[in-house]
Amino acid sequence: MNSGLDLEYSFNEILKGFGLSSELAHIIWLPLPMLLVLVSAVVGVLVTVWLERKISAAAQQRIGPEYAGALGVLQPIADGLKLLVKEDIIPAKADSILFTAGPILVLVPVILSWLIVPFGQNLLISNVGIGIFLWIALSSIQPIGLLMSGYASNNKYSLLGGLRAAAQSISYEIPLALSVLAIVLMTNSLSTIDIVNQQSGAGILSWNIWRQPVGFIIFWICALAECERLPFDLPEAEEELVAGYQTEYAGMKFALFYLGSYINLILSALLVSILYLGGWGFPIPVEIIAKALNLPIDAPVIQVFTASIGIIMTVLKAYLLVFVAILLRWTTPRVRIDQLLDLGWKFLLPISLANLLVTAGLKLAFPQFFGG
């Protein structure tokens, strides 16, 4: 389903109908995809926090927030305002420079990773040819910020939390990259746009989840571990480490960790949607929709419809995965640190490597199904 370039053309044609030049119409169009991504990130965090509170309450037979707005929808905003007015404390013997730089180094790579997240054929900030490689590189920076925060706090619990975060990230980054490499091998491209386009043509049957079920499971497990969600929240296990690397943080510095965690969760869900669930692709091919409405496939109405549906489908698939992640957090026990590392090194790493080799063999044997 092509939901970007034709939408831009239709938008420009509408503006030119009001007497604007094509250059001015193009300039007006340029910030819209960026605005969509920024708004999606901010609204996504607010919605996810509200869902987290409501789903956790349901899992524990509680009501959850209900007084701050209808059904408690304003509770995330109240949480943000509370953190905003809290005192920003730096421990007396902490390294103030590293202590301040740590949360920034955690949040910035996650936000930059949104550069390569497409909501449509042209609805992304930057269609770089190495989008997947860029995301893996950026995600490798975050553990440095976590370790820096733990070390700079001059607190034994914070240091242990930072060390755990670094060990956990290294353990799960490799199988995650190998599972993504299998997708890249089938697509012959590192571009997220190309990966989604490769899954179009036959609706839901074209999705990579059917050709890469093992890779999908490995990627999702590793993504949860990278987000430090239960059962993989060892770096901030409250029963053992108080709050891990966050122990000495308060106010807006703590809010940066909080914000980065939820943005990373949404980003991971969006990437699973893009890599394995067809991205903005609708389960029904656009040709069938156009034929049912007795309209040509390049009609402006069809293009606007498919673009709108594409955005909705991308967000819907992502939030289905967010729901699963939240449910797992509140219904599963935490694993031990040795179990966490064993799962990454002894199971996920060899399985992801075998999956990559099998994918290469299937591509040679059946190029029409696994990319030629």
Swiss-Prot record:
Domain of life: Bacteria
PROSITE patterns cross-referenced by the UniProt entry: COMPLEX1_ND1_1, COMPLEX1_ND1_2
Enzyme class, UniProt record, top EC level: translocase
Coiled-coil segments: none
EC number(s) given by UniProt: 7.1.1.-
GO molecular function, one term: oxidoreductase activity, acting on NAD(P)H, quinone or similar compound as acceptor
Residue intervals passing through the bilayer: 27-47, 97-117, 128-148, 176-196, 204-224, 266-286, 308-328, 347-367
Any matching Pfam family: NADHdh
One GO term describing the cellular component: plasma membrane-derived thylakoid membrane
Swiss-Prot/TrEMBL keywords: Membrane, NAD, NADP, Plastoquinone, Quinone, Thylakoid, Translocase, Transmembrane, Transmembrane helix
Subcellular location field: Cellular thylakoid membrane
InterPro entries referenced in this protein's UniProt entry, alphabetically: NADH_UbQ_OxRdtase_su1/FPO (IPR001694), NADH_UbQ_OxRdtase_su1_CS (IPR018086)
Mode of membrane association: Multi-pass membrane protein
One BP term from GO: photosynthesis, light reaction
Catalytic activity of the protein: a plastoquinone + NADH + (n+1) H(+)(in) = a plastoquinol + NAD(+) + n H(+)(out); a plastoquinone + NADPH + (n+1) H(+)(in) = a plastoquinol + NADP(+) + n H(+)(out)
Main location: membrane
Subunit structure, as described in the record: NDH-1 is composed of at least 11 different subunits.
Function: NDH-1 shuttles electrons from an unknown electron donor, via FMN and iron-sulfur (Fe-S) centers, to quinones in the respiratory and/or the photosynthetic chain. The immediate electron acceptor for the enzyme in this species is believed to be plastoquinone. Couples the redox reaction to proton translocation, and thus conserves the redox energy in a proton gradient.
Family indicated by similarity: Belongs to the complex I subunit 1 family.
The protein's name in its UniProt record: NAD(P)H-quinone oxidoreductase subunit 1
Organism the protein comes from: Prochlorococcus marinus subsp. pastoris (strain CCMP1986 / NIES-2087 / MED4)
Gene of this entry: ndhA
